[in-house]
Amino acid sequence: MNTIFKQKNTHPFSNAANRLDRLPISRVHFQVLTALGIVYFFDLADLFTLSNVAPALIEHWGIPLSTIANVTAASFLGMFLGASLGGRLSDRIGRKKALNLFVFVFSIASLCNAAAWDIPSLMTFRFLTGFGVAAAMVITNSYLAEFFPSSVRGKYISFCAMIGLIGVPITNIVSAFVIPLGSWGWRLVFVWGAVGLIYFFFIHRLEESPRWHENRGEYAKADAILTRIEEQVEKEKGPLPAASQPKVSETVKQNAGYAGLLKGRNLKITIVLSAVWIFETFGFYGFASWVPSLLKSNGVTMENTLWYNVLHSVGAPLGALLGSMISERFQRKWILAASAFLTAIAGLLYGMTFIPIMIIVFGFIVNITERVFTSNLYAYTSEPYPTEYRSSGSGLAYGLGRFSNIFGSLLVGFIAVQLGYISVFLFIGGCWLACSLLLIFFGPNTNAKQI
C-alpha cells in the first residue's frame, strides 16, 4: 500500500493528511486515546495537587497565603518554560520521544514533592513538575491534532480531555481521605501524582506522528507508519477508500522557528491565542488553585473545604463530556465564547455566598462550563497553525498563559489579602468575560479544516 507521491517540484510526498483523514475511527485510534488519556489523567491531576495540599501546608507549616502564592508562581514559571521549550523540542526530535521524556520528568518531580522539607525545596520541585506537565500537555494535543481525522478532531481531543478530567475529582477524593490522616498526609497526594509512570506500559501503542516525519522530508518513514496503521484499520473495518491526491503546493519546511510565529497569518493567531490563554489561566487557576485556601481563610474547616472541592470537581468530566459532544456541532470559537461567558457568571455568583449548598451548586456549574471551554480550547489551539509551527505555536500560546500566572498567583494573593474575598471572584469573572469577547471578535473558525 505504499503511496509515496511525486509533486511538481519533484519532491516525493507521503500524503499523510489525506491518508489519515479517510480512516474510520478504529481500534488504532482508541489505543492512542488510551495511552494519551493516561497522560492527560495524571497531567491534569498533578495540576490540582498543590491547591488541595495548600490548606494543610498553611495549617501544619504555619505559612501565610502569600507563601502559597510564591509556590504557585514557581509552578507556573516551570509551566511557561515547559510549554515553550517542550513544544519546540517535539518539533525537532518528534512527538513520541519528547512526550516520553516529559511524562518521566513530571512523574518523578511529583514524587520529589512528597519529600519536600521546606518552602524552597517545595518551590524547586513544583517548578520541575510544572515544566514536565506543561510540556507533556502541549505535545499530547499536537499528536492528537495530527493523528485524528479533521472531521472528528475536536471531538476526540475533547474526549481525551474528558478522560484526563476524571482525574480531577479522583485526585480530590484521594486528597480528602489522605490529608486528614496526619501532618504527613499531604505528602501522599504528591505520591499519587507520580502514578503517571504507568504510561510507559502503553507507549508501544504509539507510533511517531507520520505528519511530523513528512514535514521533515522523511517520506519513507512516514509512509511505513501510515501503511502499518492502514493495515490494522483494514483488518478491523475492511477495505479503505482511496485517499485524495496531495496538494501540489505542499512543501517541506523543516527549520521553522519562533520568528515565523510573528509573521503573516501566524502573528494574528499567536496574539489571539496567547491572550485567550492568559485570561483563561487567570480565571481557571484563580478559581481552582485558590478556592480551597480562600474558603479555609474565611472560616470553613479544612475537611469541609476538601469535600466541597470534591463535589465541585464532579462537574469537570461532565463538562468535558459535554464539550466533546458539541465540539463538531458548532464552531469551536462560539462554544468557547459562550462557555467563557457562563463561567464568568457562575464564578461571580460563587463569590457572593457562603451558604454551603450554594457553594456546591455554583462550584459545580463553574467546573462544567469551564471544562466545556478548556476541552475545546486544547483542540482549538492546535488547529490554526501549519504542521511545522503546531507544537511551537500552541506551546508558546499555552506557555505565555502559564507564565502570566506567575504574576496572576501573586495578584490573586494580593487581592485576597488587601481587597477581600469577593474581589477575587470579580477579578476571575472579568478574566472569563475578556476570553469571551476576544473569541467573539477575533477568534478564527477552525472546525473540519485539514491541518
Swiss-Prot record:
The keyword Transmembrane applies. Residues 51-60, 119-124, 179-182, 292-305, 355-357, 418-421 are extracellular. The keyword RNA-binding does not apply. GO terms for cellular component: plasma membrane. Coiled coil: none annotated. It is a multi-pass membrane protein. Residues 1-29, 82-97, 146-157, 204-270, 327-333, 379-396, 443-451 are cytoplasmic. Keywords: Cell membrane, Membrane, Transmembrane, Transmembrane helix, Transport. It comes from the Bacteria. The chain crosses the membrane at residues 30-50, 61-81, 98-118, 125-145, 158-178, 183-203, 271-291, 306-326, 334-354, 358-378, 397-417, 422-442. It is found in: Cell membrane. InterPro entries: MFS_dom, MFS_sugar_transport-like, MFS_trans_sf. GO terms for molecular function: transmembrane transporter activity. CDD domains: MFS_SV2_like. Belongs to the major facilitator superfamily. Sugar transporter (TC 2.A.1.1) family. This is Putative metabolite transport protein YyaJ. The gene is yyaJ.
